[in-house]
């Protein structure tokens, strides 16, 4: 169990490093081939997204976040259940004038070896999400 725990911790640190650097490639480097991601709460109605979608969406999102900062407030790591939870706040400027200020928790699941992330469920600030993403979608459609 100790070696699996060490592998999970190393994987988690790599994932968080990519997150802090707003670097999707770095984050997804530790994602398994069958990786999935889902935005929570369920009431938002978002489907589970496969890795292939995250590989397109994350770089696009990070590309518009200027002066990005991520502050981690809490990390809980449960080796036995192959999970970690991260509570964080990120902030950034955007080219369309809507400030990015997202308070959220990420629930991360590791594979059996602990060297890959197989799933991330991200509980977002719904008030922010419901205001930001229509503005973001409008920006994307105007800047194709």
Swiss-Prot record:
It is an enzyme of class 1 (oxidoreductase). InterPro entries: Fungal_Meroterpenoid_Isomerase, NTF2-like_dom_sf. Its EC number is 1.-.-.-. Pathway: Secondary metabolite biosynthesis. Keywords: Monooxygenase, Oxidoreductase. Induction: The cluster is expressed in rice fermentation medium. Three regulators are located in the cluster (ptaR1, ptaR2 and ptaR3), suggesting that the production of pestheic acid is controlled by a complex regulatory mechanism. GO terms for molecular function: monooxygenase activity. The keyword Oxidoreductase applies. The keyword Oxidoreductase applies. Belongs to the avfA family. Monooxygenase; part of the gene cluster that mediates the biosynthesis of pestheic acid, a diphenyl ether which is a biosynthetic precursor of the unique chloropupukeananes. The biosynthesis initiates from condensation of acetate and malonate units catalyzed by the non-reducing PKS ptaA. As the ptaA protein is TE/CLC domain-deficient, hydrolysis and Claisen cyclization of the polyketide could be catalyzed by ptaB containing a beta-lactamase domain. This is Monooxygenase ptaG.
